[in-house]
A protein has these predicted regions:
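N-terminal pre-catalytic segment of deacetylase/amide-hydrolase enzymes
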Residues: 1-6, 14-18, 25, 48-58
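Hydrophobic "anchor" residues on beta-strands that sit immediately upstream
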Residues: 6-7, 67
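Active-site metal-binding loops of divalent metal-dependent hydrolases
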Residues: 9-12, 72
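A generic structural signal for alpha-helix starts
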Residues: 11-14, 84
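Hydrophobic alpha-helical membrane-insertion segments
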Residues: 19-20, 80
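Metal-dependent polysaccharide deacetylase catalytic core of the NodB/CE4 family, i.e.
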Residues: 26-118
């Protein structure tokens, strides 16, 4: 029996370059959950570890053999948003990613794993 496991990486950070290199080397695939509204953005994990996001236009070739999934435009806490903003965050991100990567985006990952029942 074949065994399957899923690898997913969030936010499109510069570290993805190395992950993709290793995945490609060993013939493995992963899902990359991206935010189209936070390109070339730095944020600090626990106020001390800088995390830099890549410019998405620079990643089209990098992610060529992997799944791209939506992760909202700006990585908000979705449980705090009104319904109209939830729809905008998800819909605009999906459309932006499909336009940039020229393929259908089917997956979605909730930022911070917090969501609303709306």
């Amino acid at each position: 029996m074949d065994k399957i496991f899923l690898l997913s990486f969030d936010d499109g950070t510069v570290w993805d370059r190395r992950f993709v290199e290793l995945l490609n080397k060993y013939g493995m695939k992963a899902t990359f959950n991206l935010n189209s509204g936070l390109e070339d953005f730095i944020w600090y994990y626990e106020d001390r570890f800088p995390i830099r996001r890549q410019k998405l236009a620079d990643t089209v070739e990098q992610y060529r053999f992997h799944e791209i999934a939506s992760h909202t435009l700006t990585h908000p806490y979705m449980s705090e948003l009104p319904e109209w903003e939830l729809m905008r965050q998800m819909g605009d991100d999906k459309r932006n990613l499909e336009s940039l990567f020229c393929r259908e985006v089917k997956g979605f990952a909730v930022p911070f794993s917090y969501y609303s029942d709306l």
